[in-house]
């Protein structure tokens, strides 16, 4: 099997299967002294490559030599640097002009090695041996060669034709399935632009291809996965698709080698595809992006009126059939690309960098039909048209550019109703039926897929996809399918297929069929149909919610027939469903419609007429109304069946004519139509003032002059219910000449429209209101009150904010409002900047008329544009609320207050809100009167209301413990969390909770025991929440404050208020391998000294239960002051204790980590990809560390294993890469450092374990894993403490000893030296802190600033805080505003920065004692007016105090203080008791800055007492910080605490906090706070 394909006049492309010997013969036929085989290390592992190499060596000509060069794999190595290394190798080996280079590999190798050949010795011969499908059909052919640059891919290269391209299909046997499928994009592309026959052949073989490619055998060799795909079984198909694709490219290249015109046709799908690829790489592959690009560019061709909707549908279908994405929003593709956004402006910017472009004009290849491009080169397209195609939100501009004499003919697509019925009838019928004008839409796509899945008929296509051919087997081949039948939002398909499923036969593996759909489909009713089928012997289960999909239809039950009664007042489709399947029942069927007049009876008559066309005649009962008699039998398929155009869809172009005063003709719908909606023109538009001409087969409408439509007083639209939406938008601008008239159009007979894709009546009322149109909802209809003038139509808005028209994912809502949107401002003169109307979710029109927007734009002349989704803009401003759920006594009340304080949110207790709404007592009173069921119903209603109104408004909702008892409340919780809201499950030890609840008399008693309640609710709490916090019972004030700080950090982190910042400096984390952290809480602070994070090794915990693990995380948070946590589950093969194959438990643990909001998760790169991407897509604000360990020391640092793992980590877009090797010698550390230097794309933790590897831990730059002297054993071989690392690094010259001083006078009792030297000692730093006593700033400058080369910094105290400023080159904001410097920071080159950390001492003292980081809405108090008072005012302003009250013994200084600060600080001096009494604000924080060595002034004390009383209504305990270090309890502290129950913080804390701030600023590392505090405060 070998075919030679000519290109540029020579047969240099050879295509075969298993042609290894031919490849070698062909290469050695190129006479040379030197052959150089270049490949990457991945290809080098493939057995077929080794065989090729062996053959090459065996056949090497005498006197010739074979050289080999292996490059690192991946796009990251397709660089000028790699090219240079290859060239240096060739030169070092003495290669000359006669060298033949053989490039064996995929596109990266082919491109780069081709470029090497093009430039080495000014050009040497090259042979391409492509090993991937993409390389075989694309990159290896045509002579394009290149390398990447930091600014873009393939920017530097040359055209250099290879001597041969030797394609051996057998290589594909070892290709990973995703790479295989990726290559199919280029194969489909070439068929699409050039070869219609090959495209049709590809359509036919898609299923078998995907089955084979999806089921490879996978083996592992040295940690590398080897694929073995059974391409032998589809060899002919694979060979043909590769060959035909190559032929197309070869022909095009031969005609246009340098890509001046024709060759750029090969870029179909690439203009848009490359733009997506630029954003989504490396997660998305080239072919995947090109696949999306092809669909978008085909849609653009359709939008411009060039390509038919059928052809777009074919292209989309074949791409899906071969496993490729057709939209970036497909769930699997979105998860694969980690939910990356593709902003519209970014896409257009990326598209502007394209070699096809004409300067700034963007060019795109357009498609005329499958197999043929439009023209011979790419075409210029406008940004406006591109924006439209690239987005799902449409801007409709005023229709003021439509000529009033415009006369258009519009042919709508085939009827959805008739299309779906025809497919069912033909699938059940016997014989071949050619169905023409079938609607190509989402609905029919789902129906066709279902027919194929159920083996109902053989389906093929003719007339280039315009005709579908069904070869029916009379229903005998219907069998249960393996997969669920997913029907999207296709209501018609779901109802028809429910009855079809009743006729399906079981297989040996399956005895049921599952029918399911999207979220909306799972809300739409199907109960009456199910009830009738159940009563007739069919066993059907509701999988989820009663009365809705998903359904489980058991195929071992029998459709008995006989009399069937059906309630048909909701949907006529129930009737049609049973009618069409009735002939196949065991007995003749009598179908009686009960419950009142059936809805949409014309659709029932349509079904009966169609059944007659297929050979079954239904008789109407002569004795019972609405009763039908269906005989037993089989359908006989007519040879041809032509689908009539959709009459519902025809209403839109006809209404366009009515609204714009133009003429539109629909040529194939008239009075003889099967469809009731054909009456729309005569029954609705004509009475409203339109001129209507209708024949048996056509309808023409001419509208009156714009603004002259008349309201329709009453119309019964029961025969054409789907058309009522169109009537509503026409009625919106219809008015009488009477200015007192309400211009009311009344529409009735449409009750069924409430249960369509959405509640359409409610939808029209809601959306019309946005335009300023009033409506009334009727029991079975709607009243629309038309505007007096068309100029009164408003651009939709809520308040002053423009909003989009919501379409509810409903095609008819979208198409209707696309018409009204264009009438807004349509009578205004053309404006250079008109305001368009935004329509959301435009793609929903694909359900019945995918090309509607194209018709509106291209045929009817509307100006449309695309726009970035509103949600991207609104989400930035939204403050997603927090709902806290959990059992009573879980701490919800307390923690809800903390939550509100931490976020600055408003707090609402839902139980309290219920009681306020109830107004007659407490919840227990309501329950006593109405019962629990009614309470849950009302509770859910109120909850729904608050979420709808305040879910994005920054609230904390504290819920009752039983909120989750209601299924409706659970649905709301899940929906809220899915939309980005925070549902926090708060829990604690259940045994302690039970003990507490048994003593609580304040709530209504439960009938069940509390434990049973917990057992029932536990799973609900977990299912409904997206975050979880374990709140242990606190036994002391210290534990309580620790818990508060831990929770505050947790809630601020998960909500994104504070971010997890990856350190950019030298940093470390300590590894904890305890079985239970509870036993070590007192030592955890000491263990974590100097660390920037703490790792909990979950694989070492004694219990893997979710609650236990959650408790461990909370304990760790509270015991380490919220130090960032690294959550690690280390598997055995990666050096841990967790079982390697227990992936289910591992995934649960990782999801638990995300729910408890850990800062980092260590994610092993060897885990299954499904687990990895689940975590990556759920991570929110958690950072991911992609880790890989080589305990066996199997791979030196220059081995490709590390390169592959690094590329894998990049593709996963982890936040940090962590690689750990095992050093055998010191040289291993040097190799590691070379690796570190060349891999800087992501933050990298790279170390060697073992005694030889210790130096690598010292040299590692960020987050080095460390142990502690307080731990009994190390977590890994060779671990060092922070102090050991610093000491070794100092000895190596990495840290230079610095001297620090406290300057001022008197400083004899200063605790600064003790403070700082303790920190240096604990952390192993070489620095020293001393005293320099002086009252002269000049002395400080002379002896320290000018002459101390190793000066590390100065702590400045009185009297120098002002005098030192003149010697500072820079001042921080705090130093400027406070007007004093207490910290000097050397900048180098004899320059210094002045800072003030006194304010941080105050702020951090408050925050560490329970005050939120933001106290927005509260006020503060400062006692005193000296220098420290200025720091206090600055601190309270930074905390967010809305007002700062100041009091002092002498009032003169108060005015000076007020003038000192900017006006926005809102400082209010209090001088008299009356002023203090008049204060209405809540004071939550205070700082005392008056000296403590003398009694408190009486007047000052009186003022202070009055102000301390103003502390109610805070979400935290009001807190006062004392600035004086001694005594430990001052008079102000005693007053505040004992008399007014304020929390007081002694001055020692402020002293230490400000000193620690200095320490961390100077040394750029975390200070050991507790050790320092203990040293400073010891007597």
Curated annotation (Swiss-Prot):
Cofactors (names): Zn(2+)
Cofactor mode of binding and number, as noted: Binds 2 Zn(2+) ions per subunit.
CC annotations in GO: cytoplasm
UniProt-annotated binding residues for Zn(2+): 186, 270, 286
EC number from the UniProt entry: 4.2.3.4, 2.5.1.19, 2.7.1.71, 4.2.1.10
Residues annotated as catalytic: 259 (proton acceptor), 274 (proton acceptor), 844 (for epsp synthase activity), 1189 (proton acceptor), 1218 (schiff-base intermediate with substrate)
Pathway assigned to this chain's UniProt record: Metabolic intermediate biosynthesis; chorismate biosynthesis; chorismate from D-erythrose 4-phosphate and phosphoenolpyruvate: step 2/7; Metabolic intermediate biosynthesis; chorismate biosynthesis; chorismate from D-erythrose 4-phosphate and phosphoenolpyruvate: step 3/7; Metabolic intermediate biosynthesis; chorismate biosynthesis; chorismate from D-erythrose 4-phosphate and phosphoenolpyruvate: step 4/7; Metabolic intermediate biosynthesis; chorismate biosynthesis; chorismate from D-erythrose 4-phosphate and phosphoenolpyruvate: step 5/7
Lineage: superkingdom: Eukaryota
Official protein name in the record: Pentafunctional AROM polypeptide
Organism: Candida glabrata (strain ATCC 2001 / BCRC 20586 / JCM 3761 / NBRC 0622 / NRRL Y-65 / CBS 138) (Yeast)
Lineage, top ranks: Eukaryota, Fungi, Dikarya, Ascomycota, Saccharomycotina
């Amino acid at each position: 099997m070998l075919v030679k394909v000519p290109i540029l006049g020579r047969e240099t492309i050879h295509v075969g299967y298993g042609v290894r010997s031919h490849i070698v013969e062909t290469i050695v036929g190129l006479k040379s002294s030197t052959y150089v085989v270049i490949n990457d290390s991945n290809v080098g592992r493939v057995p077929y490559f080794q065989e090729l190499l062996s053959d090459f060596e065996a056949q090497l000509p005498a006197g010739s030599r074979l050289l080999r060069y292996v490059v690192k794999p991946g796009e990251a190595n397709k660089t000028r640097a790699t090219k240079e290394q290859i060239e240096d190798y060739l030169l070092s080996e003495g290669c000359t002009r006669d060298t033949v280079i053989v490039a064996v590999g995929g596109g990266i190798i082919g491109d780069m090695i081709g470029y090497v050949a093009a430039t080495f010795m000014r050009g040497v011969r090259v042979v391409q041996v492509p090993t991937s499908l993409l390389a075989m059909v694309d990159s290896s052919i045509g002579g394009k060669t290149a390398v990447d640059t930091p600014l873009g891919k393939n920017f530097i290269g040359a055209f250099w034709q290879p001597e041969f391209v030797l394609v051996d299909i057998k290589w594909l046997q070892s290709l990973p399935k995703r790479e295989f499928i990726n290559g199919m994009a280029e194969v489909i592309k070439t068929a699409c632009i050039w070869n219609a026959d090959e495209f049709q052949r590809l359509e036919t073989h898609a299923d078998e291809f995907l089955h084979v490619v999806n089921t490879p055998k996978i083996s592992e060799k040295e940690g590398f996965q080897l694929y073995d795909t059974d391409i032998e079984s589809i060899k002919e198909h694979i060979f043909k698709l590769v060959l035909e694709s190559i032929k197309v490219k070869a022909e095009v290249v031969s005609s246009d080698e340098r890509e001046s015109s024709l060759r750029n046709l090969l870029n179909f799908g690439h203009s848009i595809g490359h733009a997506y690829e630029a954003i989504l790489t490396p997660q998305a592959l080239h072919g995947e992006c090109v696949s999306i690009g092809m669909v978008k560019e085909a849609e653009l061709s359709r939008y411009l009126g060039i390509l038919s909707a059928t052809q777009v549908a074919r292209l989309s279908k074949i791409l899906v059939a071969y496993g490729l994405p057709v939209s970036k929003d497909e769930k699997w593709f979105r998860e694969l690309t980690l939910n990356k956004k593709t902003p519209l402006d970014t896409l257009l910017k990326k598209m502007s960098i394209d070699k096809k472009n004409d300067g700034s004009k963007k060019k795109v290849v357009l498609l005329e039909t499958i197999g043929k491009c439009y023209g011979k080169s790419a075409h210029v397209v406008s940004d406006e048209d591109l924006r439209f195609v690239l987005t799902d939100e449409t801007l409709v501009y005023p229709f003021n550019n439509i000529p009033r004499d415009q006369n258009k003919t519009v042919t709508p697509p085939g009827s959805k109703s008739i299309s779906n019925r025809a497919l069912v009838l033909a699938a059940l019928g016997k014989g071949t039926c050619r169905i023409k004008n079938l609607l190509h839409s989402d609905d029919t796509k789902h129906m066709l897929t279902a027919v194929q899945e159920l083996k109902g008929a053989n389906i093929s296509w003719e007339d280039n996809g315009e005709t579908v051919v069904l070869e029916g087997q009379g229903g005998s081949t219907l069998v249960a399918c393996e997969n669920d039948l997913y029907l999207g939002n296709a209501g018609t398909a779901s109802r028809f297929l429910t009855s079809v499923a009743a006729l399906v036969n079981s297989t040996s593996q399956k005895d049921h069929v599952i029918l399911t759909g999207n979220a909306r489909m799972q809300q739409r009713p199907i109960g009456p149909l199910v009830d009738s089928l159940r009563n007739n012997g069919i066993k059907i289960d509701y999988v989820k919610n009663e009365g809705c999909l998903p359904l489980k239809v058991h195929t071992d039950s029998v459709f008995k027939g006989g009399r069937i009664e059906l309630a048909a007042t909701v949907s006529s489709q129930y009737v049609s469903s049973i009618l069409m399947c009735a002939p196949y029942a065991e007995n003749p069927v009598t179908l009686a419609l009960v419950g009142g007049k059936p809805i949409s009876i014309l659709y029932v008559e349509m079904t009966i007429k169609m059944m007659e066309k297929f050979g079954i005649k239904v008789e109407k009962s002569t004795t019972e109304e609405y009763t039908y008699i269906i005989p037993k039998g089989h359908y006989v398929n007519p040879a041809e069946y032509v689908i009539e155009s959709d009459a519902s869809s025809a209403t839109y172009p006809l209404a366009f004519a009515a609204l714009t005063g133009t003429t539109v003709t629909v040529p194939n719908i008239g009075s003889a139509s099967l469809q009731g909606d054909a009456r729309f023109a005569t029954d609705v538009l004509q009475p409203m003032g339109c001129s209507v001409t209708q024949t048996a087969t056509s309808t023409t409408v001419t509208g009156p002059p714009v603004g002259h439509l008349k309201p329709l007083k009453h119309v019964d639209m029961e025969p054409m219910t789907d058309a009522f939406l169109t009537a509503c938008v026409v009625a919106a601008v219809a008015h009488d000449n009477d200015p007192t008239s309400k211009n009311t159009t009344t529409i009735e007979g449409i009750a069924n429209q409430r249960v369509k894709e959405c509640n359409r009546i409610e939808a029209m009322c809601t959306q019309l209101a946005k335009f300023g149109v009033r409506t009334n909802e009727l029991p079975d209809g709607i009243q629309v009150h038309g505007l007096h003038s068309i100029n009164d139509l408003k651009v939709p808005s809520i308040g002053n904010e423009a909003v989009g028209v919501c379409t509810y994912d409903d095609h008819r809502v979208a198409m209707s409002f696309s018409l009204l949107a264009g009438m807004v401002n349509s009578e205004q003169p053309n404006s250079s900047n008109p305001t368009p109307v935004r329509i959301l979710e435009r793609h929903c029109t694909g359900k019945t008329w995918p090309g509607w927007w194209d018709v509106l734009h291209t045929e009817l002349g509307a100006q449309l544009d695309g726009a970035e989704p509103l949600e991207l803009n609104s989400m930035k401003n939204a403050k997603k609320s927090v709902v806290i759920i959990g059992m009573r006594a879980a701490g919800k009340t307390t923690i809800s207050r903390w939550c509100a304080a931490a976020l600055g949110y408003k707090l609402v207790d839902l139980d309290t809100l219920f009681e306020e709404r109830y107004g007659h007592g407490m919840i227990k009173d309501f329950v006593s009167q109405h019962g629990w069921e009614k309470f849950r119903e009302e509770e859910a209603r109120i909850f729904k209301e608050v979420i709808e109104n305040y879910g994005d408004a920054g609230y904390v909702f504290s819920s009752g413990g039983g909120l989750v008892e209601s299924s409706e409340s659970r649905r709301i919780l899940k929906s809220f969390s899915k939309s980005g809201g925070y549902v926090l499950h708060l829990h604690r030890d259940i045994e302690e909770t039970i003990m507490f609840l048994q003593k609580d008399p304040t709530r209504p008693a439960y009938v069940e025991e509390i434990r049973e309640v917990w057992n029932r609710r536990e799973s609900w709490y977990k299912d409904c929440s997206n975050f979880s916090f374990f709140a242990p019972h606190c036994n002391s004030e210290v534990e309580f404050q620790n818990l508060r700080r831990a929770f505050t950090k947790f809630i601020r982190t998960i909500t994104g208020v504070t971010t997890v910042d990856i350190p950019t400096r030298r940093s470390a984390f300590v590894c904890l391998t305890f079985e239970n952290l509870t036993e070590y809480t007192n030592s955890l602070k000491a263990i974590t000294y100097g660390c920037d994070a703490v790792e909990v090794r979950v694989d070492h915990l004694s219990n893997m239960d979710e609650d236990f693990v959650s408790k461990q995380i909370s304990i760790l948070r509270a015991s380490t002051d919220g130090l960032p946590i690294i959550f690690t589950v280390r598997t055995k093969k990666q050096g841990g204790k967790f079982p390697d194959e227990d992936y289910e438990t591992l995934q649960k643990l990782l999801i638990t980590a995300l729910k408890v909001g850990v800062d980092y998760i260590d994610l092993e790169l060897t885990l299954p990809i499904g687990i990895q991407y689940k975590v990556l897509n759920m991570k929110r604000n958690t950072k991911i560390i992609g880790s890989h360990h080589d305990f066996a020391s199997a791979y030196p640092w220059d081995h490709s294993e590390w390169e592959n793992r690094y590329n894998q980590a990049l593709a996963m877009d982890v936040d940090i890469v962590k690689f750990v090797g095992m050093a055998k010698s010191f040289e291993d550390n040097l190799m590691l450092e070379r690796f570190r230097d060349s891999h800087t794309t992501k933050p990298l933790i790279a170390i060697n374990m073992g005694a030889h590897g210790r130096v690598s831990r010292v040299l590692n730059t960020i987050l080095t894993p460390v142990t502690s002297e307080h731990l009994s054993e190390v977590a890994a071989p060779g671990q060092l403490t922070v102090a050991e690392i610093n000491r070794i690094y100092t000895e190596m010259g990495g840290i230079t000893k610095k001297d620090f001083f406290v300057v001022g006078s008197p400083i004899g009792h200063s605790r600064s030296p003790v403070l700082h030297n303790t920190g240096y000692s604990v952390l192993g730093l070489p620095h020293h802190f001393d005293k320099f006593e002086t009252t002269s700033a000049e002395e400080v400058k002379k002896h320290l600033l000018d002459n101390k080369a190793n000066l590390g910094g100065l702590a400045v105290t009185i009297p120098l805080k002002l005098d030192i400023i003149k010697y500072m080159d820079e001042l921080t904001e705090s130093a400027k505003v406070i007007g004093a410097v207490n910290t000097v920071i050397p900048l180098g080159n004899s320059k210094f920065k002045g800072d003030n950390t006194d304010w941080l001492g105050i702020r951090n003292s408050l925050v560490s004692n329970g005050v939120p980081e933001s106290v927005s809405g509260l006020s503060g108090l400062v006692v005193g007016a000296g220098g420290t008072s200025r720091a206090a005012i600055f601190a309270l302003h930074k905390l967010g105090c809305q007002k700062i009250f100041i009091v002092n013994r002498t009032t003169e200084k108060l005015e000076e203080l007020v003038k000192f600060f900017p006006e926005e600080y809102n400082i209010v001096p209090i001088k008299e008791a009356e002023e203090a009494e008049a204060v209405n604000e809540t004071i939550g924080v205070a700082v005392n800055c008056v000296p403590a060595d003398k009694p408190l002034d009486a007047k000052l004390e009186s003022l202070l007492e009055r102000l301390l009383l103003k502390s109610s209504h805070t979400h935290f305990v009001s807190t006062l910080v004392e600035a004086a270090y001694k005594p430990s309890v001052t008079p102000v502290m005693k007053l505040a605490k004992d008399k007014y129950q304020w929390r007081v913080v002694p001055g020692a804390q402020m002293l230490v906090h400000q000193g620690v701030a200095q320490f961390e600023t100077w040394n750029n590392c975390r200070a050991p706070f507790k050790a320092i505090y203990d040293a400073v405060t010891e007597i």
